[in-house]
């Protein structure tokens, strides 16, 4: 028996939520962060993107800025991208690919698989 069998490239993963998920929702499972590209009904199979480039909500006007190449983290409590891991409470999204100023409402991030 093989030690591993190839399943697929891994840009998306299977996901069956316990509650409805709306397209664009960020889903955190342990240290894995994915984005729903389509609506997923509760208890129905769907998928989450775990690779790709997305615009994530960020605090606007709170002094939060991002430079290209910065690490971005997801604050699942406040549903925004942040600059720190919050002592492990915030999960790594990936690297910033478009700078975001303090007044910007979003930051563009390449997900880290």
Predicted segment positions?
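Surface-exposed, low-hydrophobicity beta-strand/loop segments enriched in small/polar/acidic residues
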Residues: 1-113
């Amino acid at each position: 028996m093989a030690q591993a069998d190839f399943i697929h490239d891994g840009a998306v993963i299977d996901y069956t939520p316990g509650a409805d998920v709306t397209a664009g929702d960020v889903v955190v499972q342990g240290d894995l962060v994915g984005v729903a590209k389509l609506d997923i009904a509760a208890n129905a199979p769907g998928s989450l993107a775990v690779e790709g480039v997305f615009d994530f909500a960020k605090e606007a006007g709170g002094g939060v800025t991002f430079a290209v190449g910065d690490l971005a983290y997801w604050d699942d409590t406040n549903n925004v991208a942040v600059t720190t891991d919050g002592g492990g409470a915030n999960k790594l999204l990936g690297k910033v690919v478009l700078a975001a100023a303090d007044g910007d409402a979003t930051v563009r991030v390449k997900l880290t698989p």
